[in-house]
Curated annotation (Swiss-Prot):
Matches recorded under InterPro entries: GlcNAc_MurG, Glyco_trans_28_C, GlycoTrans_28_N
Its EC number(s): 2.4.1.227
A GO cellular component entry from the record: plasma membrane
Name of the protein described by the UniProt record: UDP-N-acetylglucosamine--N-acetylmuramyl-(pentapeptide) pyrophosphoryl-undecaprenol N-acetylglucosamine transferase
Organism field: Klebsiella pneumoniae subsp. pneumoniae (strain ATCC 700721 / MGH 78578)
Superkingdom of source: Bacteria
Keyword Cell membrane listed: yes
Residues reported to bind UDP-N-acetyl-alpha-D-glucosamine: T15, G16, G17, N127, R163, S191, I244, A263, L264, T265, V266, S267, E268, Q288
Amino acid sequence: MSGQEKRLMVMAGGTGGHVFPGLAVAHHLMDQGWQVRWLGTADRMEADLVPKNGIEIDFIRISGLRGKGIKAQLLAPVRIFNAWRQARAIMKRFQPDVVLGMGGYVSGPGGLAAWSLGIPVVLHEQNGIAGLTNKWLAKIAKKVMQAFPGAFPHADVVGNPVRTDVLALPLPGQRLVGRQGPIRVLVVGGSQGARVLNQTMPQVAAKLGATVTIWHQSGKGGQQTVQQAYAAAGQPQHKVTEFIDDMAAAYAWADVVVCRSGALTVSEIAAAGLPALFVPFQHKDRQQYWNALPLEKAGAAKILEQPEFTVEAVASTLASWDRETLLDMAERARGASIPDATERVAEEVSAVALAR
């Protein structure tokens, strides 16, 4: 089968942690001549982001069931059936050789539709704990991959596909050797920010004084409040931005990152070769804790769960990391990364399509 004849449908939606890895794999296969379409929902980020990346997208109507009332739970089978019918019609038109599920609600009915049409399903789990949809789909998938060990007992560990500009950063030894002056602390709470970071880090800055310089990404609507908090702590010199458009440049600037531990963030930090202080979001299944654990075990990071993320604990942790320690941690982070994750996922997709 030549590259021009191969067709892939990517199923991913909801959050950047699902969509960005899917885009990385899609672009890699498109460069090899594959035709790629996307299955998503019209009210989430993929609706805008995927077409901007030159990929046509089809929509089905589906949403999550967690935390919904009894009426929504009772209607769920009807909604899933309708979404399955929509996905099935889309796949009948496009006739993909293989579908790739990268997570999000859309993968459930999409994967079932593909299976019902005899189209092989390939799954990639980005988190250290498998999501509900992928747990179901794993039973019918031809191939299951995972970014971190432990999500599935026998799945190949292939890492998370990350952006090429992050992979292109100089290695820690080239980037960090010879740096002087205050330790550069990058604080990242995601696009929505993280209240615990926004409230705690200005006080940490006051404790550490001139030994650190901070670049703090506050999240949407948080810039002024966080700037005022730094000023009130007597630390107005630190940089606060609502968003960071060029994360690769921010990683290149930083000596250490203080952040949540979403799957993509953890994978990017490892690929960049950066030490980290992680404060996992308190999911019921502790998903972000399990994402961060491999880097802590590798000696590249420390995890402080949210109740432990106090001014004193954060300040003492950062103060204990001198430049020599940070360089060692950075090299351990890079050593724990899987920089060819995109290629690994793409190769498995190709193998399943060829074996069909």
